[in-house]
Amino acid sequence: PDITGPTITINGSTNMNVAVGGSFTDPGATADEGTLTTSGTVDVTTAGTYTITYTATDATGNTATTTRTVEVYQSVFNYAGSAQTFTVPVGVTSISVDVYGASSSVSSGNYAGYCASGYQAKGGRVQTSLSVTPGQTLYIYVGGMSVYCYPGGNNCLSTNNQAGGWNGGGNGSGNGEAGGGATDIRVGGTSMVDRVIVAGGAGGAGSSCTHGGGHGGGLTAGNGTYDNGWYGRNNGYGFGGSQSSGGNGGYNVHSNVSAGDGSLGQGGNGVQSGGGGGGGYYGGGASAYQNSTGGGGSSYTHPTLCSSVVHSQGVQTGSGQLIITIP
């Protein structure tokens, strides 16, 4: 009697990946004899692991079964105010990532129109390929844009200063804008030293709103600026973060006060109505008076895990974002 079941050949890979919201068409399978049936569905609107089963039955009733695994993965990560995770699917050793840091804050309804949107500095962008390991967990931190508040109103710190954007944005002083938070990926842990990709956040404007802060991003982020015409005061702006140190905070020569320096992952805090520094690999320095602005935070990519790197400065408006694509 015939006791050998059919042989099933899957078309394409036995493991497939599709982004949430993408499209999936089953490539199907073939059997060398008998009738082939397919069961299982893939919901591309919901992240998860799905199984498609192929069953073949020959004329004498012998059967064979094989399966295809389809991983529907979350590809777009927006600001959440906390760490998010991504688990590398089976068979994947490289992903493409597009990472955006957050911009500086803008006016809220509490004091609408205080600083025009034209004075909002923008966050940086990093595009790269990242080497990964199947099953590995990536920790994703998407930088926030602080919501501007009028002192005494909502969204204010207890000191009536502007709260820095989540993930490293420096605080604005008084009406000075806060710096934007950085967006990063961490591997092997959740500390600053575990970051393998960082897109820097923008520096905040001083309360006079005569200039925007330094743009985030780049190996060295944008410096802040100042306005010579504001009561003749040529006061200190913050410098952009680099690959080895935070940007220096501005110095107010008239009142002998210095704003906060940037540091690893953190923008400096503004003083005397100055703007905060942007978060980044190294954060930007803050500004020391209302007519000067904070520096942006720098971007970074790991020298051996990342390839085909493109850095762009001053791209993102609003909170950050991170997009993963599996080739």
Over which residues does each language-model region extend?
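Solvent-exposed, low-complexity, repeat-rich "mucin-like" stalks and linkers
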Residues: D2-A31
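Short strand-edge motifs at loop-to-beta-strand transitions and within beta-strands
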Residues: G40, Q84, G124-T128
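Extended extracellular/luminal ectodomain segments enriched in beta-structured repeat modules
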Residues: P89-S96, T133-T137
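Flexible, low-complexity linkers/stalks enriched in Thr/Pro that connect modular domains
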Residues: P1-T4, V70-Y73
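Glycine-rich strand-loop-strand elements at beta-sheet edges
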Residues: G101-D184, G204-F239, N248-G250, G278, ...
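Short, structured beta-strand segments at or near domain termini in extracellular proteins/domains
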Residues: T183, V198, Q316-P327
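Serine/threonine-rich, repeat-prone extracellular segments and beta-strand-based repeat modules
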Residues: M16, D32-V72
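Boundary/junction segments of secreted and surface-exposed precursor proteins
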Residues: Y73-S82
